[in-house]
Each structure stands twice: as structure tokens, then as C-alpha cells.
Amino acid sequence: MKKRIDYLSNKQNKYSIRRFTVGTTSVIVGATILFGIGNHQAQASEQSNDTTQSSKNNASADSEKNNMIETPQLNTTANDTSDISANTNSANVDSTAKPMSTQTSNTTTTEPASTNETPQLTAIKDQATAAKMQDQTVPQEANSQVDNKTTNDANSIATNSELKNPQTLDLPQSSPQTISNAQGTSKPSVRTRAVRSLAVAEPVVNAADAKGTNVNDKVTAKDFQLEKTTFDPNQSGNTFMAANFTVTGQVKSGDYFTAKLPDSVTGNGDVDYSNSNNTMPIADIVNDKNEVVAKATYDILTKTYTFVFTDYVNDKQNINGKFSLPLFTDRAKAPKSGTYDANINIADEMFNNKITYNYSSPIAGIDKPNGANISSQIIGVDTASGQNTYKQTVFVNPKQRVLGNTWVYIKGYQDKIEESSGKVSATDTKLRIFEVNDTSKLSDSYYADPNDSNLKEVTDQFKDKITYKYQNVASINFGDINKTYVVLVEGHYDKTGKNLKTQVIQENVDPATGKDYSIFGWNNENVVRYGGGSADGDSAVNPKDPTPGPPVDPEPSPDPEPEPSPDPDPEPTPDPEPSPDPDPDSDSDSDSGSDSDSDSDSDSDSDSDSGSDSDSDSDSDSESDSESDSDSDSESDSDSDSDSESDSDSDSDSDSDSDSDSDSDSDSDSDSDSDSDSDSDSESDSDSDSDSESDSDSDSDSDSDSDSDSDSDSDSDSDSDSDSDSDSESDSDSDSDSDSDSDSDSDSDSDSDSDSDSDSDSDSDSESDSDSDSDSDSDSDSDSDSDSDSDSDSDSDSDSESDSDSDSDSDSDSDSDSDSDSDSDSDSDSDSRVTPPNNEQKAPSNPKGEVNHSNKVSKQHKTDALPETGDKSENTNATLFGAMMALLGSLLLFRKRKQDHKEKA
């Protein structure tokens, strides 16, 4: 596709021709004055000069217009799509920036963390007696983010339908050892059956009193291992420590040894034993016959395990055993993600380790400027004292966005009230609300110290904004906010035996528009971890070294996917007889970030979009044709008119687009596009104009040969063949006059030059030159050309094109050689006639109202009588003035010819 710069060059050539024409006119006028023509003719001549100058200005304006048309039009399609939170499960209905014909509801359902069992540590077997540990099942949580359903009515929360992701867990009947929070992950929700819940906690059984002696000096620990050293505590992550131990010498009932944990680690996880004397029972260490070898407890405050031997050891020697205990993060002492020292002391022997906590970020929500964002974590559950309390931390607007009409709902259930033991009411729930000064200082572990200077308590400001209107739901009206808040929840759960499940939801709108409704939710549930140990001894006098068990795999095995149960409702099974030994405990947390997002909203925006049509633009494809341009020569012009139709379309802008297609030259077809604006493509035709230039060939004036030509000139278009002219370029000079016609063809111009030779005959043509015509031609042609091309383009653009063509005309001018002809001015050229029709057709497309300097201008001057100005008296100065004008014109003419000669050289 030719670049528009060709047309600009042609415009410049055209302008040169006109200057030359002005010089020629000056010579003629000067000569006329010299020979004694009256002053009133001189004034009329000046008027003609003004007209010529006006034409020049119009030519410049045409060039400017073509520049404007050629300026690439960047049609930016704003594809406003609904925000979809990839890893948050939300129903996000977002208003697009432009009205859309339909509202798109994008609902992303996340998947839950797979459930898996922590690998069991193989019990150590002695060659004489196998001391078997009371192995405990370690179920992994099956938590997930919620499958949130968008709702525009806050009241619907009470219907339990907006968030669906019930999660229950398989927990063994024995006492819970530790509980860990299961946070929402990115996998689809699953249901697992719950056979027991945190509510059915065994009463604490006091361990054997450590009345004897500390025998750490007689106990040797070995084969210490951590199951893993990196995990995410916010995703119910934890590790296990395992060690073998042997007792040297005799020990008796009541003797004990200890193990101590570092600050960054805890043995109770998220289970709260503050109401149970800060003591957590540990599973007994038993032998193969289920005889208790030692009892154990864990002191929450000192983080110390105490293993107290029973009567079983009184007559035993070579006592050896092993234990495996779960370890968790200490959320207060390790508040941020990172690597911490985890040096564990067992029987006064230090085992140095490091543990890395990769907390899932608590800053979660819909990824858009006014998206709801909230998360929570259950950080303490009392499973032992019978008070059935729990503590929960909620981060509201952790992304610190500017939100309008913000509501937060804290629920004691997730999907169905009857599936959770949570109790949320004015009597069962205490809420404390804090404003965060610096969000970056929030902990990753969800630990929040009420005495922290970064937190400012504002609970009193919300006294009238906290309601319990819906069953098992606390509603908090935050209104318009731009800060982050922490809500500390102290709640209760009942004794129904169901799992404790909670959910928090935030909903808000864009404060600027009152629209763009967004909702995001987060689920929490608790998971139990178990630990225990085994030991034995023998009565043989000759001790035997214990055979160490296989080493613990430090890397956890991949989590198996839980089998989704078709039964949505958990079926709690009756609790079996409680076992006499106190069982380990649990670590609770669970959280699943269910994002309920749903921008649902607003989008209702009436999507008027009728705009869809715009698509039609696509036609622009026609561009490809552009090549066809070449054809344009075929003068398919006839079609040209067809363009007009395309104009009809959308015209205005469409055109602009059409510009793009210029290629469509292939044109006429492109017309079809016209409808779709695609026409705009046609504009691109302007390039096609270039073809039109081939028309210009007509200039080739080859006709010129025919001399008759001049008129034929008009036909000359048919000459388009003239292309052949191109050859003769050398001639360029000879009178390309005919050019005038050729004008139109600007491109051919180059050829025309060649023709011009033939012209030499054509001088006669010079008549035809009627340079003035040429001007007109330029316009006209442009049009005509354009037509032809445009025709092809028919694309509405044609108009624009016509302009562009005009450029092409300019080329023809380039034939400037025609200058020589310039004299002939006779204008007789019928050519001018040819163009005017096109000009007339194209006139409406002239957006700036420029005057097309076509043959019509020349005719007007020829037919209108010169005004009677001045008097008829002879003025002697006229002769002198005429001579000067003639001389000046001659100089201008000579200078121009010299320049032309240099350029051709």
C-alpha cells in the first residue's frame, strides 16, 4: 500500500504548478498593459490573481485536509470485562465502563485443600519386646473457600444461600491432641463426614504426678527428626517431631524426663487451655499390651512436656521407646512469615533445627479498586474446660480501599445453621473493633494484641451499628470507610457434637457511584492433630539394644484428594465410651478464604450498548484488498458512486475508520463494508487513490498525441493506459500540459511526464492544458480518482478518499512540465468537464468546506464579464507599469524554468 507521503509530494508539485501559472499570468498581464490596455483591465487581472491565490490557499488546505485524513486513527476497543478473582471464590458481577447489551456474571468456584493424613511414624521394635505406640490418626483438614453466590440484598444472608461450601472433617473418636486452622484454598469444595466434633472433648485427666526424680541424666534421645521444616500455618500446616529414647539404669514410678520447645513453636497449636490450668494432656506411652509405661502432659506457659513413668517400670530394665508429637507455630512469637530457630531440648540434650513459616497472606479480597476484602482465623478454641469458647480474629478491608456502604457479617455457620456448633448472638458473642494505624504492621499469623499501639479501639463508635437481626449472624455497619479494621471475636459453640464452622462476609459498593456491588467471604473450621508414644522394657538381665525404626521422612507425602461425599449433611456418630486416658489435643484453626465476591451488581448498568454494531467495523478487514488498488486503474470508477452508499453508513466516524482500510480499494467490495463503518477502511483507499493515479495516466496525454485530445483529455482518463507513459518519463517536460487533466492522476503523473513528450505534439494540447483546469482537475480528479478508487472503496470513506485522491491529482500536476503548455490556458479542455461531476458528487465530503479549485472556477472567469472599473483615459504610466510587470513575469518564468531544468538534470 502506498504511503500518503506520495500524495503530499503531489500536493507540493501542484502548488508549484500554480505558482508557475501565476508567473505566466503576470507576464501576460504585463504584456497586455505594455501594449496599452486600459487600467480597468489591469484591475480585473488583479482580481484574477486574487482568485488564483485563493486556489493556492485551497490547495494548501486540501493538503492539510489530506494530512488530517492520513493521520492513523487508533480505534481503541474498550473491552470492559467483569473482574474475576482467580483464586478467590466469588460471584463477581462487575459493571463495565460502557453499557453492555448483557450483563456477564462470572462465578469462580475455588477448590479446597485436599485432605491427607500425616504419615505415621513407625513404632520402634525391641528384639525382645515390641513396644508399640498408641498410634493416632492425624486427619488433614478439608477446607476450602466458599462457593459464594452473589446477592444484592443483605437480608438474604439469613437465607443461608449466598455462600455454599459446607466442610466437615473425619476425626477419630479419641481425644483431640491439637487443632489447626484449615484455611480456604483454591480447590473445589468437598464434603467429608464428621464423626465427632470439637464440642465432644474428653475431660482433662491429670497426668501422673511427677513426685519422683528428674531422670533426664538417665534418658538418651536419638534419631530425632522433624517431619518437615516448612509449612503454612494458615492452611492448617504443622509438623511432627519424632525421637527414640532409651533409659539407662533403673527408674521407678514417678520418675520423669522432660522435653522443651523454643519460643517460635508450640505444642497446643490453636487450642486454648487457659481455663484448664494451662495444662494439655498428652496421649499415654503404652506397650504392645496397652499397658501404660508413662503419662505425659504439656505446660502451655513453659512449653515443656513432662513424661512420668508408671508402676510398669518398677521391675523393668532396658526401657526404650519413642514418641511422635505435633508441633505448631506460635502466632504471637512468630507473627510474620520467615525462618525461626526451633531448637528442641529433650532430656537436656539440644537438637538444633530451623522452621520456616510461609503464612498465607491475610490480605485477601476482590482484585479491583472497590472490591470487598476480608479474612479471618480462629486462633483459640477451648476444648477441655467445658466452657466451649473460641476466639477469632477478623481483618476488615486489609487492602485499605475506599469503600462505600460497607457491611460485615460474622456467622456461626457456613452453609446450614444445623451443620455447625457455632453460636453467634448478643449473649454468646463479644466483639471488639480496632482501627489499624499502619496496615503494613498487621501480622501474617492473625495474632492481634489489643494493647498494640498500632491498634486503636473504636468499639464504642459501633455500639449502635452492631445488630443480631439474623439468626446466628452478627451484622456490623461500617458505612463508608478507607481504613483497615481488626475485629476480635469471643464466641461460644454448643455441645451438639458438630464441628465448629464460621464464616465472615464483607459487602460494599463503589462510594463514587453507589454501584459496583462487591461481596467476599471467608470460611473457618477446625482440624484435629494427634500425637502419642510407645515404650516397653524387658525383665531380662542382659539388656539388648533396641532396633531403631525406619527414619521419618522429613517431607510429607502428597496429600490425597478427599472423596467428595454425596451426602451434604454430616452424620455425627455417637461417641464411644471415653477412654480413660486423657487424649491429646487439638489445634484449631481452619480457615478457608471463601471470597464471596460478587460485583454483581451495579452492572445492571442498563447496558444500552446498541453500540454492538460498532463491530461492523470489523469489515475493515477489507483492507487486505488494498492491494487490489492496482486494479483501481481499471477505472472501475463507475462504481465509485456506489461508494456513496457506503457513505450512508455512519459516515462520519465510520469514515475515519474507513481510513484504516484504505486498502479496501479492492474496493467496490469494500463498499459493502461501507455499512459497517468498515467503510472507514475504504478511506484507506485514499491509497487506492494512488491507483486512481493510474487514471491520471489518462494524462498520459498519450492522448496528447492525438492532440485532438484536449477534449479527449477528459476521456483521456480512459487513457489510463497511459501507464505505459510512465516510460517516457524523460519527456516529463513536454507540456505534460495535458497533465492538467492528468492532474487528476497524480500518480500517473510520474508517467504523464513521459507522455508529456508525445505532448510535444500535443502542444496543441497545450490548449488542453488549461492549467487552470488542471487545478480544477486536481480537485476534480482527486475526486474522480478518488472515485474510481473510492469507488472501489465505495466505502463510505470514499469521501475521505476523494480528498486523498485529490492528492493524487497533485501528482499529475507534478507533470508540472505541462508548464510549458501552461500557456495554452485555453482551458478549452473538456477535461475540466469530466471532473466537475465528480467534484459535485464529492463536494459533500469536504468537511472543511474548502473550495475545490476545478475547471468550474476557470469557466466562471470566462463567462463573467469583467467589471467596468476605472476610466478609459490612457495613462502613460500604464506602459511603464506593464513593462515592469512583463519583466517581472518573465523573470519569474525564467527562474521557474531554470529550477525545473535543474531538477530534471
From Swiss-Prot:
GO-annotated biological processes: cell adhesion
An annotated GO cellular component: extracellular region
Biased composition (Pro residues): 545-555
Motif (LPXTG sorting signal): 866-870
Bias type Basic and acidic residues, positions: 861-874
Record bears the keyword Oxidoreductase: no
Keywords noted in UniProt: Cell wall, Peptidoglycan-anchor, Secreted, Signal, Virulence
Positions of post-translational Pentaglycyl murein peptidoglycan amidated threonine modification: T869
PROSITE patterns: GRAM_POS_ANCHORING
Protein's membrane topology: Peptidoglycan-anchor
Site (Cleavage): S197, L198, A199, V200
Biased composition (Low complexity): 102-119
Biased composition (Polar residues): 44-61, 68-101, 134-189, 833-844
Chain location of the short sequence motif MIDAS-like motif per the record: 272-276
YSIRK-G/S signaling motif, short sequence motif: residues: 15-26
Main location: secreted
Compartments (UniProt record): Secreted, Cell wall
Disordered: annotated span: 44-191, 530-877
Prosequence residues removed at maturation: 870-905
Acidic residues bias locations: 556-829
Location of region: Ligand binding A region: 45-542
Post-translational modification: Proteolytically cleaved by aureolysin (aur). This cleavage leads to the inactivation of ClfB.
Domain remark from Swiss-Prot or TrEMBL: The Asp/Ser-rich domain functions as a stalk to allow the ligand binding domain to be displayed in a functional form on the cell surface.
Function as written in the Swiss-Prot or TrEMBL entry: Cell surface-associated protein implicated in virulence by promoting bacterial attachment to both alpha- and beta-chains of human fibrinogen and inducing the formation of bacterial clumps.
Family membership noted in the UniProt record: Belongs to the serine-aspartate repeat-containing protein (SDr) family.
Protein name as annotated: Clumping factor B
